[in-house]
Amino acid sequence: MTKIIQISDTHIVPEGALAYGQVDTAAALAETVATINRLLPQIGPVDLVIVTGDLTEHGTPEEYDRFKMLMADLDLPYRVLPGNHDRREPMRESFADAQWMPRTGPLDWQIDFEDFAVVGLDSLTESAAHGTLEPATLSFLTDALSGLGDKPAIVGFHHPPFAVGIRAMDAQNLHDADSLGTALSLHSGQVRLVCGHLHRSIAGLFSGSLCQVCPGTSHAVTLDQRANAGNSLTKEPGGMLLHEWRDDGFLTHLIPVGAFPGPYPFLGVS
């Protein structure tokens, strides 16, 4: 049974700094890694961790080095995708020793497992907050899905392809979603879309497939759907998603970050 864990929006800043003057994102990522390692005996084996963008706050080499240092304690392999806070070339350089990191062009990749493949797409628009899929990325996706036949696929990228009612964030979603839908429609197998960016657990249908948005590891985008709402964060607990193939379909679990009391046996249950 193939399983992957998704984390997103770690927003690592330089040592001694707080993201937005409020959030210790490094401590949150360290706790996320510890949570994953602690849960592995209960949920394993897990094949991969994917990070769906915004690894850093400013996309600097220093921040990528700090991200990698914090992830070094993870007991699983991981792959990353860029978000709007990342910068493509510093990110490429930071992961230059990884065989899966493209040497040129968009930061797209694919990995095949027994039950499904994972296709990672680069939705970064340099110098803008919204997402786009370059023609090279759309071609990469089309070729990847064509090569899979009817094998299921998880397709990961940073920017959600639909609006969620948080107006400031909806303006920053994936702007060429129709092109993505066209590429997905050509695949005969099951597809699960996984994104980040919104720092909340949100699920919706897109092009006939379930799209699951991952919460951030350290803070949430405030759930405020009023027309005049600004863009703000709320210090809600961090979370992650466990995606697995079970029987004949994808299943996703929401896992909070942290250590909690328990487990306690249910009274009267043998």
Regions found by a protein language model. Name each.
Residues 1-66, 106:
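N-terminal active-site segment of His-dependent metallophosphoesterases
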Residues 2-14, 115-125, 154-157, 209-215, ...:
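Active-site-proximal beta-strand elements of phosphoester/diester hydrolases
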Residues 6-8, 47-54, 78-84, 122, ...:
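Active-site neighborhood of phospho(di)ester-bond hydrolases with catalytic His/Asp-centered motifs
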Residues 13-15, 57-62, 84-92, 126-129, ...:
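Active-site environment of divalent metal-dependent phosphoester hydrolases
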Residues 18-24, 97, 127, 166-173, ...:
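Short glycine-enriched, charge-decorated loop/helix-capping segments at active-site entrances
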Residues 30, 35, 183, 205-270:
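Binuclear metal-dependent phosphoesterase catalytic core
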Residues 32-48, 130-210, 242, 250-251, ...:
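His/acidic metal-ligating clusters that form di-metal
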Residues 60-146, 179-189, 229-244:
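Extended active-site neighborhood of metal-dependent phosphoesterases/phosphodiesterases
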